[in-house]
From Swiss-Prot:
This is Glutamate--tRNA ligase. One of its GO terms (biological process) is glutamyl-tRNA aminoacylation. One of its GO terms (cellular component) is cytosol. The lineage of its organism: Bacteria, Bacillati, Actinomycetota, Actinomycetes, Kitasatosporales. It catalyses: tRNA(Glu) + L-glutamate + ATP = L-glutamyl-tRNA(Glu) + AMP + diphosphate. HAMAP family: Glu_tRNA_synth_type1. A motif ('KMSKS' region) lies at residues 270-274. Zn(2+) binds at residues 122, 124, 149, 151.
Length: 504
């Protein structure tokens, strides 16, 4: 094994090579927004540099991985529009792209590391490790692996095996500091006592993440590793492993590393994938646009300009520079996420918006019977709805008055609107509306305006009882356009029903 001084690694290892990045999730549970942000930054980096995004599945944990989660990952990436250049369903020169199908490769690399002295068998039992770790803590010393099996003789190994002990494989860390320049955090130096020898193969022969991840990066010629801050501590170990892989002819170079900031949730705690607001499925079910969600997630650690929050994916790709990513934790703000999504909804052309709302206009989201839906009325109301909704699922409550036989019953809205003398106001408004031109929303507005004036009310106060009578809600789409689209007979019938309820 070579003993040359450990090199100081630069953040830029382009060397004229095309940029190759990877997104490598594990198929466990539902995709979450932190995972999406990592995928987005890798995708934007690859597209900005006309590079390659490798989509790799880290499915070596048979107890936790599932085919359902794997399919969810693929579906989520497709829904988000984050296309990949190599990986599942596409293939590529480094296939297969599922780690569970690459076990022979890892076994071969582990054997080469052992043969060259970069790794060694460790026979320590869990109890022995715990005892020595506790003793180190009590003495105020580092509690990592103490190198007990680092330099066993052949006789000592044979003796352990004669006892029936099994062994894991540990990688031998260099006895010197490792310095690297993180693309996000700058120069980082880690002392050897803080990075002990670590396991790379289990006793049953199964390779660990600590081996398979950097081996795949090496074999797939990854040039830049952009990942979460939680993996920063593993970087010195991987850099040391890369040095060994390079000397064995398995890797060409050590990639540049960039560690993205934590995403914080409620109470300034790191957003966990178990937090309800972390689930990507939540945003899909609520009707976030992929562009709106990605726009917001890109702001968790990066910005396109100090005074600009809304931009397209093309603009993101054109501007994205990993060196502009902030190392400080980013707080997830649902309200801001909703605001940005609403702006992206406004940016859609009406036809695209109309089509995008489709799923929320039928079962299981829509409370009306399928035959009650009127496509012509929906097409007419859609432009007004587009200026009001925050997420696409908002559309159901905004237009249900058109397709239900009767407006929804909301006692809070009813109580709020029917103050003063609502019977007198609605009676006058009904008479004025009956005589109005129902092809002209302005005529309907004047009908309610004059009714209000007759009772000493401004338009805002006067239209509230009419709105609740017709739509069931105090807040909604422009009232007079809504009345026109609902139609004269149905609108007047609902005012009559409200009067009957008030006088019962």
């Amino acid at each position: 094994m070579a003993n040359a001084p450990f090199p100081k690694l630069s953040a830029s290892l382009d060397q004229g090579r095309p940029h190759r990045v990877r997104f490598c999730p594990s198929p466990t549970g539902n995709p979450h927004v932190g995972l999406v942000r990592t995928a987005l930054f890798n995708w934007a980096f690859a597209r900005h540099h006309q590079g390659t995004l490798v989509f790799r599945i880290e499915d070596t944990d048979a107890a936790r991985d599932s085919e359902e989660s794997y399919q969810q990952l693929l579906d989520s990436m497709r829904w988000l529009g984050l296309d990949w250049d190599e990986g599942p369903e596409i293939g590529g020169p480094h296939a297969p792209y599922r780690q569970s199908q690459r076990m022979d490769l890892y076994k071969d690399v582990a054997e080469k590391l052992l043969a060259a002295g970069y790794a060694y068998p460790c026979y320590c039992t869990t109890e022995e490790l715990d005892t020595r770790r506790d003793a180190a803590r009590a003495a105020g010393k580092p509690s990592g692996y103490d190198g007990h099996c680092r330099d066993l003789t052949a006789e000592q190994k044979a003796a352990y095996e004669a006892e029936g002990r099994t062994s894991i494989v540990r990688f031998r860390m260099p006895d010197e500091a490792i310095t690297f320049t993180d693309l996000v955090r700058g120069e980082i130096t880690v002392q050897p006592e803080n990075v002990p020898d670590y396991g790379i193969v289990r006793a049953n022969g199964a390779p660990l993440y600590t081996l398979v991840n950097p081996v795949d990066d090496a074999l797939m010629e990854i040039t830049h590793v952009l990942r979460g801050e939680d993996l920063l501590s593993s970087t010195p170990r991987q850099i040391a492993l890369y040095r060994a892989l390079i000397e064995l002819g398995i890797a060409k170079d050590t990639p540049a590393f960039g560690h993205l900031p934590y995403v914080m949730g409620e109470g300034n705690k790191k957003l966990s994938k178990r937090d309800p607001q972390a689930s990507l499925n939540l945003y899909r079910e609520r009707g976030f646009l992929p562009e709106g969600l990605l726009n917001y997630l890109s702001l968790l650690g990066w910005s396109i300009a100090e005074d600009r929050d809304i931009f397209s994916m093309d603009e993101l790709v054109a501007a994205f520079d990993i060196k502009d990513v902030n190392a400080n934790p980013a707080r997830f703000d649902l309200k801001k996420c909703e605001h940005i999504n609403a702006e992206h909804i406004r940016m859609l052309d009406v036809k695209t918006f109309t089509e995008a709302c489709g799923p929320w206009l039928k079962a299981p989201f829509a409370p009306w019977a399928p035959e009650a839906f009127d496509a012509e009325k929906w097409t007419r109301i859609a432009p007004y709805a587009q200026t009001r909704v925050t997420v696409l699922s908002d559309i159901t409550d905004n237009v249900d008055f058109l397709f239900l036989d009767e407006p929804v019953e909301d006692e809070a809205s009813w109580t709020k609107a029917m103050k003063g003398d609502p019977v007198a106001l609605l009676t006058t408004a009904r008479a004025n509306l009956e005589a109005a031109d129902w092809s002209d929303p302005e005529s309907l507005k004047n009908a309610v305006l004059t009714a209000g004036e007759a009772h000493g009310l401004k338009l805002g106060k006067a239209q509230a009882p009419v709105r609740v009578a017709v739509t069931g809600r105090t807040v909604g789409l422009p009232l007079f356009e809504s009345l026109e689209i609902l139609g004269r007979d149905r609108s007047l019938a609902r005012v009559d029903a409200a009067l009957a309820k008030l006088t019962a």
